[in-house]
Amino acid sequence: MLYDAIIMSVKVISVVDDMFFASKIRAVAEAVGKEMSFPRSLEAVVSKARETKPGLIVVDLHNQRIDPVVLARELKSNEDLRDIRLLGFFSHVQTDLKTSALSAGFDEVIPRSVFARDLQEILTAD
């Protein structure tokens, strides 16, 4: 699983427009000393990734502002950004989102419930 991989950077980008999950991610990140950013457009995510070189980008595959498939293709086609780990989470009943995300270049896609349960472990894996 992704969170078994080495995530050395203290910087994480979160592409989440659900206020509940954004709040939960922010609280856990602060508790474990991770620097979080929450860009709200495709251009802002790419720009922030170039600027900060995060160890991880977490993406809500149900995001209404940013198409996760387009985001993954953009990041993975860029030589400077392709090594950033992409973790997507989704409603377990929408397996088509999982398939699309993995095909687009996500490193791992997990159900939303697993993401919520394992968030601290995901952010502190090393």
Language-model region placement:
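Alpha4 helix (beta4-alpha4-beta5 surface) of REC/receiver domains from two-component response regulators
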Residues: V93-E108
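Short hydrophobic/Thr-rich beta-strand motif most characteristic of the beta2 strand and flanking loop
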Residues: G33-R40
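Conserved phosphotransfer cores of two-component systems
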Residues: K76-L81
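Conserved phosphotransfer microenvironments
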Residues: V59-L75
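Output/docking surface of receiver
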Residues: G105-R117
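Conserved acidic segment of CheY-like receiver
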Residues: V10-M19
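Acidic, metal-coordinating helix/loop segments flanking the phosphotransfer/catalytic sites
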Residues: S41-L56
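A short, hydrophobic beta-strand element within the central beta-sheet of small alpha/beta folds
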Residues: D83-H92
